[in-house]
């Protein structure tokens, strides 16, 4: 019996693939590792989505690392639980930036995504969401 990939896992993997492309273009970070932030609800009502993104990112980054990483650098995930809350998402994002992330995968729901997007612009941080789908996520008012 052939196992089908779920839409959720496909979207999680797609987000990680896109972030890896951004990292390749940016050249990564200094040192031997490139830190990638993964942000989403890991607990609470919509935790299944956040956990899927972390699982997809972990799997993909493991595969990239097994093939030598990006430009010879290994990828490291820093995942944080924003508990489905926009304020907590911004707090987690700031903590991840303090830990040296180079790019962000997530958030997974619209309200936290929009809150973090405003902050990521201030940090000039590439951000990819696999599942936030409201028009405001892709619309730039400027």
What feature does the model see in each segment?
Residues 1-35, 66:
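Short, low-complexity disordered leader/linker segments with a strong preference
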Residues 30-37, 126-130:
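Short coil-to-beta-strand
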Residues 37-56, 80-86, 108-111:
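Extracytoplasmic "Venus flytrap"
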Residues 54, 58-61, 90-93, 113-121:
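Extracytoplasmic/secreted envelope proteins and their assembly/folding machinery
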Residues 55-77:
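Signal peptide-proximal N-terminal region
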Residues 74-98:
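Structural motif
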Residues 101-142:
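Extracytoplasmic ligand/sensor domains, especially the bilobed periplasmic-binding protein
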